[in-house]
C-alpha cells in the first residue's frame, strides 16, 4: 500500500452516506422490522413479495419497478441487505400462527447499538465475508467457506482496474448475474467499494447499470485485505493467538475496536418437544426431552420405525444464519466439529413448524423428515422419549431378495 492510500483509510469517516449508504439502508430495515418482525416466505424465508415495493422505496436510491411480479432478487440491494440481516446474526426465523416471520434478536440488537459506526460497518463486512452464503437468499450455495467475499474481490481485481463500461456491451450485464452476482455487486456499492452509473434509457433491466467504477476507498481497503483474501485457506483466525481478521485495516482505523458477536436468540430452555417424524407414508409423533443428545434422538427415531441402528447418520438443518449445517455421527468426519454425541436437542435453533432431516444409512439413503410441532417448557430431568401417536406401516429396512 502507498502512504497516500494508508492516509486515505485513516481519514475515512463513517456515516449515513460514507463510504457508502450501507449503514443508513441497513438501519432502515431494522427500524421497519421493529419488535414485531416481518412476514417472510415459507420455503426460503425471503421478504414477502407484498412488502418489496415498500422496502424498495425505503432505500437511499430505490429502483424503478419494471416487472409485473418482482421477486426479492429483482432488487439487488434489498437482496444483499437481507443476506446481511441473516448473516450478521441480528435476526432469526419463527413461526407465528400460520405466518413465518423474520424477527430481530434483541440481545444482538443491544450489542449492535453499543457499537460505533465504523464497528457496525466492519461487523457487516465480517458477516458478508464469513457467512454470506448464497444459500441464505435461496440460491445455490457457492463461494468458499470462511470467504464468501471472494467472488466480489475477484471481480473487483479482474474487471474494475479501469472501470467497466456497459453502454456498448449491454450483454455483459448477464455475466454480472453470475460473477460477482447482482446482490454482491449491490453490496459492493453499499459498502462504498464501487460507484455505479444508471441510465434507464439505455437498459431495460430493473437495475439499468451502464458503468461501474472502483472508488479510492475500495482500492485502498481491499489492499488491506489482499493477503487474507488470497491465502484464506492458510489463516485460522479463530485459533488463540492467531492474527485477528482485519488486523491491518483496524491498525489504521483507530475507532474500530469491537465487533458484533451474536450469541444466539436465547438460552436453551428446559422442556419437551413434540416432533412429527415421517418416512414415506408412515409417521410417528415423538415426545422428546430437550436435554437428551442427538444420538439419543436418533435411537428414538430408529426404534419408532423398527429400524436397527447398525449404520452411520447425520442431522441436517438450517442454522440461525439460514445456512445448512450437518451434525454427524462421531465416527464421521465433520469439518465444523459438530457431533451428535456432543449436542443436545435443546441446543438446536428449533422453532414450531421448522423442518429438518435425519439422514440414516448412507448406502440405502434413508431420510426421515422431522417437523417441530410444539414445545412445552417443563422440568425434563425425569422425562424419557416416547411415541405419542403413530400412523402407517414403515418401509422395510432390508429388502428380501429371492434367488
Q: Which residues fall in each region the model found?
A:
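Extended intrinsically disordered, low-complexity coil regions enriched in Ser, Thr, Gly, Ala
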Residues: 49-53, 92, 163-168, 178, ...
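Short acidic, hydrophobic short linear motifs in intrinsically disordered regions
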Residues: 37-69, 141-176
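Short amphipathic alpha-helical interaction segments
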Residues: 71-87, 173-195
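Hydrophobic residues on short alpha-helical segments
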Residues: 23, 27-30, 146-157, 185
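Accessory beta->alpha helical hairpin/"wing" motif in late/C-terminal subdomains of nucleic-acid enzymes
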Residues: 81, 92-143, 195-244
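Short, solvent-exposed secondary-structure capping/transition elements
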Residues: 42, 78, 87-101, 310, ...
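Short, amphipathic alpha-helical interface elements at domain boundaries
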Residues: 1-80, 96, 107-112
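Short linear regulatory motifs enriched in tryptophan with gly/pro/ser
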Residues: 2-18, 179-196, 201-403
Amino acid at each position: 500500500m502507498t502512504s497516500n492510500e494508508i492516509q486515505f483509510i485513516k481519514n475515512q469517516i463513517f456515516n449515513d452516506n460514507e463510504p457508502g449508504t450501507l449503514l443508513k439502508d441497513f438501519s432502515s430495515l431494522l427500524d421497519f422490522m421493529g419488535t414485531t418482525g416481518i412476514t417472510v416466505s415459507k420455503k426460503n424465508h425471503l421478504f414477502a413479495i407484498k412488502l418489496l415495493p415498500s422496502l424498495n422505496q425505503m432505500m437511499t436510491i430505490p429502483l424503478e419497478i419494471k416487472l409485473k411480479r418482482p421477486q426479492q432478487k429483482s432488487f439487488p440491494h434489498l437482496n444483499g441487505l437481507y443476506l446481511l440481516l441473516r448473516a450478521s446474526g441480528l435476526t432469526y426465523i419463527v413461526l407465528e400462527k400460520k405466518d413465518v416471520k423474520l424477527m430481530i434478536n434483541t440481545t444482538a440488537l443491544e450489542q449492535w447499538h453499543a457499537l460505533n459506526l465504523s464497528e457496525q460497518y466492519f461487523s457487516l463486512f465480517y458477516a458478508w465475508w464469513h457467512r454470506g452464503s448464497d444459500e441464505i437468499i435461496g440460491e445455490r450455495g457457492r463461494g468458499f467457506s470462511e470467504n464468501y467475499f471472494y467472488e466480489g474481490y475477484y471481480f473487483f481485481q479482474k474487471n474494475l482496474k479501469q472501470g467497466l463500461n456497459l453502454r456498448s456491451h449491454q450483454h455483459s450485464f448477464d455475466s454480472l448475474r453470475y460473477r460477482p452476482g447482482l446482490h454482491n455487486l449491490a453490496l459492493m456499492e453499499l459498502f462504498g467499494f464501487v460507484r455505479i452509473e444508471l441510465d434507464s434509457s439505455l437498459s431495460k433491466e430493473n437495475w439499468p447499470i451502464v458503468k461501474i467504477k472502483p472508488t479510492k476507498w475500495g482500492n485502498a481497503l481491499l489492499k488491506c485485505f489482499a493477503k487474507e483474501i488470497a491465502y484464506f485457506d492458510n489463516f485460522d483466525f479463530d485459533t488463540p493467538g492467531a492474527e485477528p481478521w482485519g488486523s491491518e485495516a483496524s491498525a489504521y482505523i483507530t475507532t474500530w475496536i469491537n465487533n458484533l458477536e451474536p450469541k444466539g436468540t436465547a438460552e436453551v430452555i428446559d422442556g419437551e418437544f413434540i416432533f412429527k417424524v415421517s418416512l414415506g407414508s408412515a409417521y410417528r409423533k415423538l415426545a422428546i426431552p430437550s436435554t437428551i443428545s442427538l444420538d439419543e434422538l436418533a435411537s428414538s427415531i430408529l426404534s419408532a420405525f423398527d429400524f436397527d441402528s447398525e449404520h452411520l447418520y447425520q442431522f441436517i438443518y438450517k442454522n440461525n444464519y439460514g445456512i445448512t449445517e450437518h451434525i454427524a455421527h462421531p465416527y464421521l468426519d465433520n469439518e465444523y466439529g459438530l457431533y451428535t454425541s456432543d449436542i443436545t436437542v435443546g441446543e438446536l435453533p428449533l422453532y414450531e413448524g421448522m423442518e429438518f432431516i435425519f439422514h440414516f444409512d448412507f448406502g440405502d439413503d434413508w431420510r426421515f423428515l422431522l417437523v417441530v410441532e410444539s414445545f412445552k417448557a417443563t422440568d425434563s430431568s425425569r422425562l424419557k422419549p416416547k411415541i405419542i401417536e403413530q400412523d402407517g406401516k414403515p418401509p422395510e429396512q432390508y429388502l428380501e431378495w429371492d434367488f
